[in-house]
């Protein structure tokens, strides 16, 4: 998918927005707090039904308003819209003007991937951040995984309640059996997804981090000891669970470790190299989504200049030209964008007369096109 037109109403600090985007490359330049990240957040919200910046949906509405709308039209005139009324709590999902009940219906048409300065939490934020990254990708590749995950969490809550309240053995055994069954199902789907993701990674590492590409390994930890089945692991940890008051093993405890020569990746790479690895991993996930879901993702990169020197940005420009999807990039200064602007490989291939990119200035929530980026060449 490529977004041709983005419209927002009452979203964050943005003025009412209606902008036309380039099918390949778009730049938004502005100071911190100008609204650049809010624009990315609007697109992310449409693709996932939640924010990458806050868990509180009320923070997404403009000051002193109680509703907001995000909608797009793609290059084939497909229209997608998502609105939220904070007073009633109603979320309205529309596809070509028709109401739909589930976000998974939107996910079949739009896939959004993002890299932000906060993405470093993938390395330093603990297992929760790595789980979040994997789940955001699975949401688009395995549309029924969200339903499966909701059912698993329902059973997890019941089993934890049994532990905390020391319920009778029959009730506890029932929920434990169901918990093990669902854990194994979730782990199998997740393992397959991660295997497919890892298979896409080396190609992008060769472009972005060629010196370490053959040294990187990815380790999937299912959430309980590899050499034991889950039921045995739970039985052996019964006293510990009683002391803690929750399930210490299961699919909710999975993790993914990124290693270089068997050492934690973050201990071996500079911040700039870590960002390039994050980008390679995101590109791998984007290509996997496109291959399986047959929907080209929209890639959002917030603050492109942070951590990346000129050589890294040139490598990134090369990778983006190969990725073949719509890219939306924010930056504080126009100068950091020069490698991307200079790279003629991002030119629109359909006509040499079309512009190679669109550029916008963002100031106080207002978005204005830069004249020379929208002229016909």
From Swiss-Prot:
GO cellular-component term (any): cytoplasm
Pfam families recorded: SMC_N
Signal sequence range: none
Gene3D superfamilies associated with the record: P-loop containing nucleotide triphosphate hydrolases, RecF/RecN/SMC, N-terminal domain
Protein biosynthesis as UniProt keyword: no
PANTHER family tied to this protein: DNA REPLICATION AND REPAIR PROTEIN RECF
Lineage: Bacteria, Pseudomonadati, Pseudomonadota, Gammaproteobacteria, Alteromonadales
Location(s) in or outside the cell: Cytoplasm
Function field: The RecF protein is involved in DNA metabolism; it is required for DNA replication and normal SOS inducibility. RecF binds preferentially to single-stranded, linear DNA. It also seems to bind ATP.
Cross-referenced HAMAP family: RecF
Protein name (Swiss-Prot/TrEMBL): DNA replication and repair protein RecF
Spans traversing the lipid bilayer: none
Residues where ATP binds: 30-37
Gene from which the chain derives: recF
